Regions:
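C-terminal peripheral helix-coil segments that are non-catalytic and often amphipathic
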Residues: 1-16, 101-108, 154-158, 176-177, ...
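Helix-turn-helix
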Residues: 27, 31-69, 73-74
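Short, charged helix-capping/linker segments at alpha-helix termini
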Residues: 42-43, 159-166
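Hydrophobic alpha-helical connector segments
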Residues: 73, 86-118, 168-174
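Short, basic, alpha-helical segments at the C-terminal edge of helix-turn-helix-like DNA-binding modules
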Residues: 76-83
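Amphipathic alpha-helical segments used for helix-helix packing
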Residues: 98, 111-136, 183
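Amphipathic alpha-helical packing segments from all-alpha helical-bundle domains
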Residues: 112, 131-158
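Short, well-structured alpha-helical segments
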Residues: 150, 164-175, 196
Length: 209
């Protein structure tokens, strides 16, 4: 009986240690992302990261082999976070009336989700120094959204909801102001109203009569 109790206690302690380790790893990633976005990757040292999470350098290296591994993990996690949200849009089954809500929902996500805001800021800062960052930025915030919208419009054209035209050109027209205000930052009630009006006018202009 005593062995069973000790065994369960050991399991609980092991689980608690794993939770602590996971929590510290997440803190390291988040604080590193903030530092990289504000200062640039090259300007941030592991000592700065350790100070931000109130730990020693040894704790950082316990979870990550190098500063580069921290960056790579951040990039992968943010990419998964972004794509998970984007993939909630079921293009093949969506209807014409959902265009406005989809656009506004994605805009709010990209301007309010702290990880994504910092991720974009990091890519903007680093795109001129690292070709990989430039490619990521284009794919995640320019090419990806345009391709998704074009795919959506292609289906809506086939279904007879939209006038026949170039789906990619339609996508560029709709996405342009959203991209502009992503880069500027900030979100006001007036801006949201203007963007909603932009989507409504776009829908009216391209609706098949």
């Amino acid at each position: 009986m005593k062995c069973c109790v000790n065994g369960r206690r050991a399991q609980r302690e092991e689980m608690m240690e794993k939770d602590k380790a996971g929590s510290m790893k997440d803190r390291i990633l988040y604080e590193s992302l903030k530092l990289f976005a504000d200062n640039g990757y090259a300007a941030v040292s592991t000592r700065m990261i350790a100070k931000a999470v109130e730990a020693s350098d040894a704790v950082i290296y316990k979870h990550f082999k190098s500063k580069r591994e921290i960056l790579d993990t951040i990039l992968e996690q943010c990419k998964r976070r972004y794509l998970a949200k984007r993939n909630t849009v079921r293009i093949a089954t969506m209807c014409w009336d959902e265009v406005e809500s989809i656009c506004m929902d994605m805009f709010s996500f990209q301007t309010q989700d702290e990880w994504i805001v910092l991720y974009r800021k990091l890519l903007v800062v680093e795109q001129y120094k690292d070709p990989q960052m430039a490619v990521l930025y284009r794919k995640m915030f320019i090419e990806g959204p345009l391709e998704s919208l074009a795919g959506m419009f292609r289906i809506l054209i086939e279904q007879g909801y939209m006038k026949k035209g170039n789906p990619m050109v339609y996508a560029m027209e709709l996405y342009a102001p959203f991209f502009l205000f992503h880069t500027v930052g900030g979100e006001s009630e007036e801006l949201l109203q203007n963007l909603e009006e932009h989507v409504r006018l776009f829908r009216e202009n391209v609706r098949e009569s």
